[in-house]
Amino acid sequence: MKIGVIGYGHRISSVIKEVMKADVDCQIAAIVDIRKDAVKAQLDEQGWHHIHYYDTPEQMFAAEQLNGVMIGTRCNLHTTMGLKVLQHNLPLYIEKPVATNYEDLLRLKQGYEASTSPVVVSFPLRVTSLVELVKEIVQSGKIGTVEHVQAINNVPYGRVYFQSWYRNEEETGGLFLQKATHDFDYIQAVLGQTPVSVCAMTSKQIFKGNKSAGLKCVDCEDNRICLESTVGTVEGLDPTWQYCCYAEDTGNEDSGSALFRYESGMHMSYSQNFFIRKGAAARGARFMGYKGTVDFDFYTGQVKVHMHHTARVETYDLAAGSNHFGGDAKLARNFTEVMKKKASSISTLDDGLMSALMCMKAQESAQTGTFQSLKWE
């Protein structure tokens, strides 16, 4: 099974490893990357001498007979590169978010509808053992129909969104698209309901300031006293997290919340935070019905069912796992099966489009102070 890669970044490289673990028949046949010489040197050291390298997707498609394509470019190129693959009707694995603006989202939707490509979107949380157990409990009717959802994501490594390239909102599309997209997707996977409107709010209270644009920690006069300084740190931070998070060009909100109304009349609340640290980390949700409540947290690896009319609480302890809590391995295996026509996608582009639409409408609501309808317009 020959796979082409467009954009060989850190994230997609880890997914590729999972794909090759899942199926020994899979191999990377070709890579398109603006850093192709550096990527070639890196992979040659690993003994991957068989790979062909190209400057453009068009060159790759003209020269290679591929069984599938994986896209790992920066976020603002996901749509453009995705459309190139869809035109060839090849199986596609695409990173989230599938688009970073509404125009691209519509283009991708139209391209998908005109293509026969099966698509797997990188939404690993929906296929973790935790979420699958919650979905099983909800679908059993044990807690009754879900009539309210409360979800949170308190991110302990939030500095990456203010000190690395993620701080550029033009590339990322903002933090609803970067983080909430995962959460909105797993909530949708559990609920199976249609959201119709949203109101949202964001704040930037911590990571703002008047330090000069482009300032790096190493060049800052406060780098020995600043709590966010990467100079002399003992935490082993990624060396690319080098920019000042208090500079005037630091993008992204540091907290955000959204309320979604569904067709049934129920609503879901979601809140995310990017300046908490250490033990304050939390990521999960509560699904509430009249009979009971089921809640879970990815960091603890626990699922709890609280019955409302009996003195009973059920607790399930599951290993949280690594690589998005084990979800990456499941998606990788699914992609290999999709390429071999043995299975359908368990994380479709329809799912990716809906999650992106929810994020974009939440962002628009926060920017305009208005309710937004979740319609394709």
Language model features with spans:
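Residues that mark the start of a beta-strand
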Residues: K2-G4, T145-H148, H267
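A contiguous active-site-proximal alpha/beta segment in oxidoreductase catalytic domains
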Residues: N76, A99-Q163, E169-F176, T181-F184
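Contiguous beta-strand/loop segments that form the cofactor/metal-binding neighborhood of enzyme cores
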Residues: Q178, H182-T300, L331-E337
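Beta-loop-alpha module in the N-terminal Rossmann-like domain of NAD(P)-dependent dehydrogenases
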Residues: G9, W48-G111
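C-terminal helix-rich "cap/oligomerization" subdomain common to oxidoreductases
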Residues: G68-M70, E263-S264, D295, T300-Q302, ...
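N-terminal Rossmann-like dinucleotide-binding module
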Residues: M1-W48
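Active-site loop of classical SDR/Rossmann-like NAD(P)-dependent oxidoreductases
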Residues: I34-A38, K278, S322-R333, D350, ...
